[in-house]
Amino acid sequence: MFRGADGQASKSGFRSMKPPGGESNDIFGSPEEGVPSSKPHRMASNIFGPTEEPKNIPKRTNPPGGKGSGIFDESTPVQTRQRLNPPGGKTSDIFGSPVTATAPLAHPNKPKDHVLLCEGEDCKSDLKAATNSTPRGEQGEKGSSTEAEPAKIPEPIPTVDSHEPRLGPRPRSHNKVLNPPGGKSSISFY
């Protein structure tokens, strides 16, 4: 067994009370300062105490080189813009201003042969006059020999064989699923 400097048997598990370099923990050899640092330890937590703010850092209320936020300036009334749709709808006459109902604009991709809803007999008579005046004007230019022919030629009903690809996919007459959700299988069921 190892005997220490004082002649007693040393037990393996105890540290020596005095390390070989002395009691100092300073490994760089600088003289110890007895004055503690004025800064609080940055890892120390003081959640219940008063907050300590550094005194030498100036507080900024405005961003550097920027314009002030205007929070503390005198407030000016905000201009409210006029609503496009009044509270009661477009034909509402709450405020006494005459508002005329306008027809909704058609979407450019929608077909333009839809019939607009009209109120009263005026719209029906205008619609009939507009449809009847165009064929009569064309017939008057061509001559009186074409008056015996019908003014409107019925359009042929499209069939599966005369399908145009730009109108969408051809309707299917079978049960086969081409793109199933789990992926295409090599087994085919008929």
Swiss-Prot record:
GO cellular component terms, semicolon-separated: cytoplasm; cytosol; nucleus
Biased composition (Polar residues): 130-146
Keywords assigned: Acetylation, Cytoplasm, Nucleus, Phosphoprotein
Keyword Transport: no
Chain positions found as N-acetylmethionine: 1
Quaternary assembly: Monomer. Dimer. Interacts with TPCN1.
Protein name: Jupiter microtubule associated homolog 2
